């Protein structure tokens, strides 16, 4: 099965997301998918809170005249803005944009709050819906008209040094987040022609999907003083002088959820990282005539033992065990524990890992400790497998002065191995013309195994 077909199929069958809403590019998070989203963003919120960010919430509606202040920035997506033009039947004097991103709203308010150097640094974030009139082919959780989960952080600082340090903190924070949810990444400094409009520079996280295309999963932007000058974000320095603040912003969206689904899944269905799994352990009673009560009493006891540490579900449906196995493998539940009369007699339980399919017999009396060990192995294995999978998609090519010859080799490699091609840096190929020659994207400058490369790939 092709990856795109697998992806659409699994979102529906595993109860992640329903596309049947009557607006292109808009869908519904189903309960199981919403829980994956919730646990993922809880990790992100914790990382942000621990590094001094404060969560807030800004309006969705932006007056046209305020949005226009963004100048260069708004040019990057002015054709994608949704507009509210009427209140009931009455035309509005000023059109209102549905938030495409929040620089305008947040920086307008920051101007009200930042007056002197003691008001800095200011580190805010929100998790909100954003809207883009996507005209390209939309994909669930990947390319949407309503992005339902957009985490955007915006910070303001007194000095360039503090601003640069914030970029490093943001990169470290995002590394920790993607490591936690088991999504491998390659970090690139985006080229000038592909950076965030209005930024000094952009750093981006990309992962590689099973079809060999790359997906941008996170971005970190150093805005310098560019937006501060537009929005007159001035403050009084310790010397009594006036200066503009230095700013950063960084975002992660539903693509993080799409990626943890895509990177780990297999022919049986989802393989969910433990920390974001709605159900971490499913218990399956193996019932035999005359032994039902013994098994159910024991497995309920096991449920009570485990639920103090894990999210556990006891599947007591009146259907065959094999169907239960298939259902929970499809949903990617990390561990399955089977318990039958013979297991109880022998003082054992059988644990089955979703990532490897390995069946492990453990002592029932020591089951909590055994489960904790297996969960730890599951986490490490999932991370290593994903990293190895991504590494297998990376090809390093030597630079050649003959750009046409090099471009043909790049195209051949992209067809053969797909993924990311790394080429030693040379100015002659670091341009949009080279993108056209290779019919792919220049992701930017990437450090790989201690060396700097130009990274190119086919992207979503």
From Swiss-Prot:
> What is its subcellular localisation?
Cytoplasm
Where does the protein principally reside?
cytoplasm
Q: What is this protein called?
A: Proline--tRNA ligase
Organism whose genome encodes this protein: Methanococcus maripaludis (strain DSM 14266 / JCM 13030 / NBRC 101832 / S2 / LL)
Q: Which Pfam families match?
A: HGTP_anticodon, ProRS-C_2, tRNA-synt_2b
What are the UniProt keywords, alphabetically?
Aminoacyl-tRNA synthetase, ATP-binding, Cytoplasm, Ligase, Nucleotide-binding, Protein biosynthesis
Task: Extract one GO cellular component term from the record.
Answer: aminoacyl-tRNA synthetase multienzyme complex
Q: Which biological process annotations from GO are given for this protein?
A: prolyl-tRNA aminoacylation
Encoding gene per record = proS
Instruction: Quote one Gene Ontology molecular function term.
Output: proline-tRNA ligase activity
Q: What is known of its domains?
A: Consists of three domains: the N-terminal catalytic domain, the anticodon-binding domain and the C-terminal extension.
The reaction(s) this protein catalyses: tRNA(Pro) + L-proline + ATP = L-prolyl-tRNA(Pro) + AMP + diphosphate
Matching PANTHER family: BIFUNCTIONAL GLUTAMATE_PROLINE--TRNA LIGASE, PROLYL-TRNA SYNTHETASE
């Amino acid at each position: 099965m092709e990856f795109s077909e697998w992806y659409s199929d699994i979102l529906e069958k595993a109860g992640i997301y329903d596309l049947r809403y009557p607006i292109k590019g808009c869908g519904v998070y189903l309960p199981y998918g919403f829980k994956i989203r919730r646990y993922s963003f809880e990790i992100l919120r914790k990382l942000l809170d621990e590094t001094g960010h404060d969560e807030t919430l800004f309006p969705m509606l932006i007056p046209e005249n305020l949005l226009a202040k963004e100048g260069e920035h708004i040019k990057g997506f002015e054709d994608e803005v949704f507009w509210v033009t009427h209140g009931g039947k009455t035309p509005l004097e000023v059109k209102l944009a549905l938030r495409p991103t929040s620089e305008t709203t947040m920086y307008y308010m920051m101007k009200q709050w930042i007056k002197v150097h003691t008001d800095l640094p200011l580190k805010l974030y929100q998790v909100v819906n954003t809207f883009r009139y996507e005209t390209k082919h939309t994909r669930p959780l990947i390319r949407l008209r309503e992005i339902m989960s957009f985490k955007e952080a915006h910070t303001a600082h007194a000095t360039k040094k503090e601003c640069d340090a914030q970029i490093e903190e943001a990169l470290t924070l995002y590394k920790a987040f993607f490591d936690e949810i088991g999504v491998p990444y390659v970090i690139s400094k985006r080229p000038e022609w592909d950076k965030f409009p209005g930024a000094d520079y952009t750093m981006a996280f990309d992962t590689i999907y099973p079809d060999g295309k790359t997906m941008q999963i996170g971005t970190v932007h150093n805005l310098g003083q560019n937006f501060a000058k537009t929005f007159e974000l001035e403050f009084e320095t310790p010397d009594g002088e006036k200066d503009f603040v230095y700013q950063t912003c960084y975002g992660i969206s539903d693509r993080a959820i799409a990626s943890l689904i895509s990177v780990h899944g297999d022919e049986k269905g989802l393989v969910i990282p433990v920390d974001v799994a709605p159900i971490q352990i499913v218990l399956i009673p193996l019932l035999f005539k005359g032994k039902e009560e013994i098994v159910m009493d024991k497995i309920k006891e096991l449920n009570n033992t485990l639920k103090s540490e894990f999210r556990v579900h006891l599947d007591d449906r009146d259907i065959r065990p094999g169907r239960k196995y298939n259902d929970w493998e499809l949903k990617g539940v990390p561990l399955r524990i089977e318990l039958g009369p013979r297991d109880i007699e022998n003082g054992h339980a059988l644990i089955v890992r979703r990532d490897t399919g390995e069946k492990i017999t453990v002592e029932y009396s020591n089951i909590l400790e055994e489960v904790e060990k297996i969960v730890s192995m599951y986490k490490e294995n999932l991370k290593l497998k994903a990293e190895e999978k991504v590494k297998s998609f990376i090809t390093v090519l030597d630079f050649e002065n003959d750009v046409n010859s090099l471009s043909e080799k790049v195209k051949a490699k992209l067809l053969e191995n797909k993924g990311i091609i790394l080429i030693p840096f040379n100015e002659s190929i670091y341009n949009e013309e080279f993108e056209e020659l290779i019919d792919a994207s220049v992701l930017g400058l990437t450090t790989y195994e201690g060396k700097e490369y130009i990274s190119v790939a086919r992207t979503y």
